[in-house]
């Protein structure tokens, strides 16, 4: 039985005060960590403070991206060593916005996954197709290619502790979402790729999230599906009430 994981991706939202207020509002109301992992991936500027504010709760704090080098002349970047030094638990890697706006490649994402693992940070590896690819019927081919590239060079026991997030690009922030059956089909295909690369036990252990306009009114159906183990959530993670609703749905899935 895979434990669900709900990860909020705040992107470039919230002031410092708003971020602290959010954590204060949710940290005493979280479902048991035995039932669901609760994660907030906040802007990098806030990470050290949020880790401290949430330290007495079961809320895990994550980053939204990172470099793969530990140090160097990379202006504006944040290293895995720096994230680890402030006790960040998770990091989102390969989000479609990073791929599109910052030209992140599959090769770079693979290096970032390795760097995260080396510092005991759980990578949330994103994959997903464009609307054009979906209409062309190449969704599973595209996603399989991204996953194979991201997982290249790793051992099964490493992959078991990763999180994979399927986010169809056309559904991110658009209000559109894949049907629960469609999302489950692609998440199942991802699990099959993991089995092909490693083995059935690894495929059964790895957690696969769905992301793309996940909201309190559709999360129950999504989480009822066999291959969907949680959600990577944007807008619905910005308000304490909706975030807690998502967590409760996952805890009772």
From Swiss-Prot:
Enzyme Commission number(s) of this protein: 5.3.1.1
Pathway of action: Carbohydrate biosynthesis; gluconeogenesis; Carbohydrate degradation; glycolysis; D-glyceraldehyde 3-phosphate from glycerone phosphate: step 1/1
Entries under Gene3D superfamilies matching the protein: Aldolase class I
Pfam family, one: TIM
Subcellular locations according to the entry: Cytoplasm
InterPro entries tied to this protein: Aldolase_TIM, TIM_sf, TrioseP_Isoase_bac/euk, Triosephosphate_isomerase, Triosephosphate_isomerase_AS
GO cellular component: cytosol
Gene Ontology MF annotations: triose-phosphate isomerase activity
Main location: cytoplasm
Record: active site: 95 (electrophile), 167 (proton acceptor)
UniProt record, GO biological process: gluconeogenesis; glyceraldehyde-3-phosphate biosynthetic process; glycerol catabolic process; glycolytic process
Source superkingdom: Bacteria
Residues that coordinate or bind substrate: 9-11, 173, 213, 234-235
Catalysed reaction equations from the record: D-glyceraldehyde 3-phosphate = dihydroxyacetone phosphate
Keyword line: Cytoplasm, Gluconeogenesis, Glycolysis, Isomerase, Phosphoprotein
Residue list for modification Phosphoserine: 213
Subunit-level organization: Homodimer.
Family membership: Belongs to the triosephosphate isomerase family.
Biological role stated in the UniProt entry: Involved in the gluconeogenesis. Catalyzes stereospecifically the conversion of dihydroxyacetone phosphate (DHAP) to D-glyceraldehyde-3-phosphate (G3P).
Stated name of the protein: Triosephosphate isomerase
The organism's taxonomic lineage, starting at the top: Bacteria, Bacillati, Bacillota, Bacilli, Bacillales
